[in-house]
Amino acid sequence: GKYQFGKSALRTVGIYDYQEFLRNAEWQDKAFEALIARNKWELRKEIQKYSGRIINGVEITESGLVAAAHLGGAGSVKKYLRSNGRNGFKDGFGTSLSSYIRKFSNYDISHIEADANAKVNLE
């Protein structure tokens, strides 16, 4: 697919047919936006508190934090921030939260509302 999602993440946004998801670019885009909305909600306090700060030489931004949550989960991002970057997650390929925070720091995701229960509308 266009983005990397675990099956459990897809289920949280209402997608249960993984094969159809892989074939359907529209579902992939909708799932991506729904997961951004959920991560923005989950990280809303951290976004407000940490945006603009520098941790490990990287400026903290909303889009960077949301991308890092896509990599390692919102809980890992919270631990990273609370530890001032000392408690860092890496995925199975060695990709770190801080690398995602840097790489995705300047994206405008303001058009996506924070939503604790965001789901994909499949109609």
Task: Describe the residue ranges of each PLM region.
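Non-catalytic cell-wall polysaccharide-engagement segments
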Residues: Y3-K30, A34-E123
